[in-house]
Amino acid sequence: MATRAQGKKIKKVVKKDAKIHLRQAIKIDPDFLDARYELGSLLLSEGELKGAEEQFNKVVKLDNNHAEGYYKLALISAENRKNKKARDLFEKAVTIKFDDAKIQFDYGLFLKKLKKYEEAIEHFTKAIEANQNFSEAYFELAMLLKDPEDYDRAKKNYETAIDIRPDYGDANYYLGKLVMTGIQKDSDGTLLSQPETDYAVTCFEKVLKIDDTYSKAHLRLGMIYADRDEHDEANKHLRLTLKLNTRSSKALYHLGLVSKTLSKEKEAIKFLKRSLTHYSKSYLTHFHLGLLLKENQDIDKGITHLNKTVELNQEFDEAYYYLAKFFEEKEDHESAKEHYMKAIARNHKHRDAYYHLGLLMKKLNVMEEAKTYMEKAIETDQNFTKGYYHLGLILNDPSNYADARKCYLTAIDIEPSFLMAHYHLANLLSSGQRLKKDGTPVIRKELKLAKKHYIESLRLDPKFPKIH
């Protein structure tokens, strides 16, 4: 039996002999179209583009309806980056032979390379019409159906490619990737996320049965298991990804998040830093690294990475929010306020940004602003216990007696065990200081109710010193 090397040598000799015989045939009959086409095809397969082009030009001159000749010339022009010429030649080929699946498919690939996606979709569809068992055409068509409104169509095309060819690794992988996010539009155009993670896991596991070195499938499984808090499985697949691709910034990023969840902060920091060495423009990596560095007592480096986060993504409200908190901790109140405001400008329903900005304004004794921001926090979340409680503290003035009383009571209604709300409500009721409608100060103590809330405070914490 011939070895692989011997087999290659034999093929080379056969091709060489074939070329000699074809050239001899053409010498005898220069108009021998089939000989020229076969010689051109042999030269093209060996990368001799100039010689191949010469033969195919002769072919289409001899027969101006020779679709395969125009097709091969189109492939050569595309290889030479003569895109306009290639396109014209593809058009001639598909006009003459519109039901040739291979020509339609390769024209689709050419258009995809030019980013003419709608036209590529048209030709992949025509390839499928010509050959309904053309798995690669279904796959390439699915790959271009990226709009959420085409979700079902993309899914069906991936599944058809796999039905035809069950060992189609890429089709299984990209089907898994599609259903993992489940981003689609319903009939009225509303954007939905309906992930099918079990289905995705099945797809990725099939990929790994076909090829256990398919690193991206390990990565996706690691991401899914991390979301499910199955940290051992997540860790296993993410480390396998890294073993197969040491430069995988995504694997390093997700390993960092898993390590953080497991309270292995130092390990998490190492993974995130390594991730940035391979891809420095990941705003999420900078964000999580910034938070971790702050937790590990390096607030300045934390700020550096959060600043990089907002440089890379100027609309990321959470980064502005945490920057504000870090600046507030450093007692840079002006920068803190500025960044809380930036968070709110990007997310008008950012409850915690309103809340902490309200607390900051209270600390700075800017009480009207403090009141406004705390009210905004409550507006975004009407069950926000701490919001009602702190608004009650802000309204600690005889002119706002009724409103403060209402805030404390609301906080207690939502969270009956909120000790400090009971305590400050009791203080307010026992003081009884309020204003009449005409602005005259008056004291009307509510001692019975005050006593009730003091007692409740003691029940919640018998050692609470302020009441004793």
Q: Where do the PLM segments sit?
A:
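Short, intrinsically disordered, charge-balanced linker/junction segments flanking boundaries
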Residues: F204, R459-H468
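A generic tandem-repeat structural signature
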Residues: E68-E79, D88, K102, D106-K113
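Eukaryotic tandem repeat interaction scaffolds
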Residues: Y321, D352-K362, E379, F384-D397, ...
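Structural signature of tandem alpha-helical TPR/SEL1-like repeats
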Residues: G7-Q24, S45-K58, E79-K92, K112-K126, ...
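Helix-start (N-cap) detector for alpha-helical repeat units in TPR-like alpha-solenoids
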Residues: L33-D34, A67-E68, A101-K102, S135-E136, ...
